[in-house]
Every structure is written in C-alpha cells, then in structure tokens.
C-alpha cells in the first residue's frame, strides 16, 4: 500500500485500486526485479510526498526521470546532491539568473522549491537505466493526468509551467479560470534558445501569485 503521508493519500486512494494502476504495479514489480530502473523504488512518489495538494502553488511538469546513475530522486528536473547538474537544469538556472538575478548554485537538488509548494511532477514516474521513455505508455500518464485534474479543481490559484510539447499537451486538462499556465519550448540545449531563454516564467509566476494574495516562491537554490 502506498503511503504518501499527506492529503494525496485520500485524494488518490481510489486511483491506486484502478485496473490500469494494478497492471502498472505488476509491470513495475517485474522491471525492478529484472532491470536497473530509476529512481529508487522508495523515491517514485517523492513529488507528492514533499508537496501536499493543499500546498501546491506551482506545477513544473517534466517528462520521465533522468536515466543516468544516481540522478533521479522523484522530482522533475532535480538531481540528488553530489551529482553533476544536467544540461536542462543548467538552462533553468541560467534563465533564473537572467530573470530574477538568482545566483547559480553548485547543485541540482530542488527540494527547497518542493518545500514551498512547487510540485515537481514528471508525467511518467519511472524509467529503465539508459533508456529514455522506456516506461511510457504503461499507465503512468493516466495517474499523472488525474493528479493534474485534481490540482485543476483547487480553489486557490496555481501556476502551471509547461515546457516542451509533451507538457503543453496537458493544457487541455486545465479548465479552471483561477489558474494560469505559461508555456515555452523545453529547456533542453536542443531547444532552449528557441524561446525558453528569456521567457521570464519565474518572475511572471511570482507576479501572478502576488496579484492573487499568495506568497511568492523564493527561487534561489542554496549552494551546498
């Protein structure tokens, strides 16, 4: 039984008994037994564990976890301490520096954002080592769509940051006029120069939150 330790337990309890999820669970059992899979089994739901639904102010949507050793720990774009900062996150830090003058930290550990109400959610929560998108289409997308739908129902305003085509597909789930979404290309080096750099999503997010009487996010990640 999955224990998230906050309001997500009640909000998702029916979901974890759905046939698609039970099938996904069997698939994951086999994958973890026979393959190298990231993140660690106990880190799969960290995004939900760190950020309760009632606390969500911002959602940053990723695709699937990093597939290199020691990187993924259940939060989109974040890596564990002591691991080299991946290129997409380097570009996020660069945009933060240009937008809000944040210093570029020496690590990619984004727990500080999660603690402030930034839900760092991948649309697929597991991946085989070295094989991007290897767990796509197994059922994770149904669950993460449901999570987005639940957040969409919140009364308090939420900002959705949707970077890249995969993330932009989720716009159709956002029907609540209280929320807003900012979209751009993905921060990957392949696309960042085509509209991510200079998007000012971080200052725009804080502006929206403040206009709605919500405490803004301190985006500065401390160096370790």
From Swiss-Prot:
It catalyses: Hydrolyzes single-stranded DNA or mismatched double-stranded DNA and polynucleotides, releasing free uracil. It is an enzyme of class 3 (hydrolase). Its EC number is 3.2.2.27. Excises uracil residues from the DNA which can arise as a result of misincorporation of dUMP residues by DNA polymerase or due to deamination of cytosine. GO terms for biological process: base-excision repair, AP site formation via deaminated base removal. Gene3D superfamilies: Uracil-DNA glycosylase-like domain. It is found in: Cytoplasm. Belongs to the uracil-DNA glycosylase (UDG) superfamily. UNG family. The active site is at 64 (proton acceptor). It holds the Pfam family UDG. This is Uracil-DNA glycosylase 2. The keyword Methyltransferase does not apply. GO terms for cellular component: cytoplasm. Signal peptide: none annotated. It comes from the Bacteria. The keyword DNA repair applies. GO terms for molecular function: uracil DNA N-glycosylase activity. Keywords: Cytoplasm, DNA damage, DNA repair, Hydrolase.
């Amino acid at each position: 039984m999955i224990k998230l330790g906050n309001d997500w337990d009640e909000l998702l309890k029916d979901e974890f008994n759905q046939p698609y999820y039970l099938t996904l669970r069997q698939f994951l059992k086999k994958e973890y037994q026979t393959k190298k899979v990231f993140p660690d089994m106990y880190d799969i739901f960290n995004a939900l564990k760190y950020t309760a639904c009632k606390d969500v102010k911002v959602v940053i949507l990723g695709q699937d976890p990093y597939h290199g050793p020691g990187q993924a720990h259940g939060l989109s774009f974040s890596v564990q301490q002591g691991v080299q900062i991946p290129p997409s996150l380097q570009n996020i830090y660069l945009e933060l520096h240009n937008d809000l003058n944040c210093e570029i930290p020496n690590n990619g550990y984004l727990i500080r954002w999660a603690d402030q109400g930034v839900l760092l959610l991948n649309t697929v929560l597991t991946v085989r080592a070295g094989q991007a998108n290897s767990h796509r289409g197994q059922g994770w997308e149904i669950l993460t769509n449901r999570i987005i739908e639940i957040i969409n129902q919140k009364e308090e305003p939420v900002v959705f940051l949707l970077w890249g085509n995969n993330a932009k597909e989720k716009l159709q789930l956002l029907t609540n006029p209280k929320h807003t979404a900012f979209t751009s290309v993905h921060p990957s080096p392949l696309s960042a120069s085509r509209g991510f750099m200079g998007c000012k999503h971080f200052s725009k997010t804080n502006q929206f939150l403040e206009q709605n009487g919500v405490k803004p996010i301190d985006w500065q990640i401390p160096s370790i």
